[in-house]
């Protein structure tokens, strides 16, 4: 029971982006730029928040390790300590390197994370699991020590949402909660023609940018995945988010585990508002909805 929240958080963080995707590289592309470690489109704040989450997780795993009797440590190392701490160090290695490229972290910290992965894997490959684990599968660049380089460009700023909801946070509507699925583990499956209602209070401007984040699955019936957004009774046209083949959007969706659609809608000046999400096809899974002040052009 003590380990359940630890493993759930480990899976949640990896759901947002897998450890092997943290270097922003790809294995099947011909363009050489995808063989080189590069920045993720994350702000310094987002990077530090993720590093802190993994640090807290790793510390908890270490505490449990020291409390275990000797006869249980091998099993714990295999099932918990290695997968959680190796993932934490992959994130530490690559995200710290991203900060270091912009002069916001010490390169030595990235190198220490790499050394930690080597040490953890060496420990794994003893006794029962001798020579089973490889910390550099297929010798891909993402598993190497990160090359030191400096960038003159800055990191992006985190855009602040005014309201954020998980699919399960709706005020009204019927849906099936998908426990553990989604960026916060609260995505919902919405049946065809069913609605979810989200409520918010007075808005400061005459328009709102709505960002809808969905599970990037494939169509269940036919070839479409569609929804509409209605704000105070004014509905959008059907919004499609299915992908075709191995398109660039499909690849990006796989890497970040979300399909995203954005729209700007007019907002009347009133004390409260109702935003209604309607699924138009079977297979629609809503992860999150974010509301932003529209960007100034």
Residue ranges and their predicted role:
Residues 1-173, 272:
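Substrate-binding groove of N-acetylhexosamine-processing glycoside hydrolases
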